[in-house]
C-alpha cells in the first residue's frame, strides 16, 4: 500500500506534529526510515537566523521539537535510520538519532557538483564554503547489518544540486538496496512507490520562487499522488 499524508502547510506546532505522526503510523512498523528534518539554524549571537535566504521560505523546528517526534513508534524491532543533517548541526543530528532510539554507525556524504563535475560552491558556511551534506546512518535492534549490497556500497554520492533543500534521488535506490523495507520517509517532498510519505510537501515539490536552473519544475514529475 502506498501511503500519503500531509500536514497543514503552516507554521509547525510540535504537539500537532507529534499527534499527526502517531495517527499516520497507526501501528505500522517500518524497516528503514529516511528523515530530512527542517533544522533551525542560529547565528553567532544565538538568535534564530536562516543559513540562506531561501530558508526563510520554510518553516523550521527547534531541536527539542525534532527530538520529541515519536519516530520510535514507526520503527520495526530491527530498523535502519537515514538522517540528513547539515555540517554545522552534526552534534544535533547525533542527538536526534539517540532520542529516536537509534545507535549511530556510519554516514554517507553527498557532494554537490556543477554540470562540469566540479564542486558547486554556491553553498554557505561561516568557516568554509559547504559543498557537502551528511546522511547519518543508525540502527536499532540486533542483527541490524545492511543487506549484501551494502557491503560494497561506498559511503559517498555526488550529484547536481537542485532546488533548495532537495536531496539527491540517488538516495532512494541506495536505501532500497541496502536496507529491508517497509520504507518510510519523514518530511517527504514527494511520493515514491514502496514508500510511506509523511510531510507537508509530500504530494509534490515544485518551487514557486527563482531557484537553480535544473530544479524539478523543469522535469517530468517523479512522483504521483497516491492516497491510502
Q: Where are the regions that the model predicts?
A:
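Class I S-adenosyl-L-methionine-dependent methyltransferase catalytic core
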Residues: 1-228
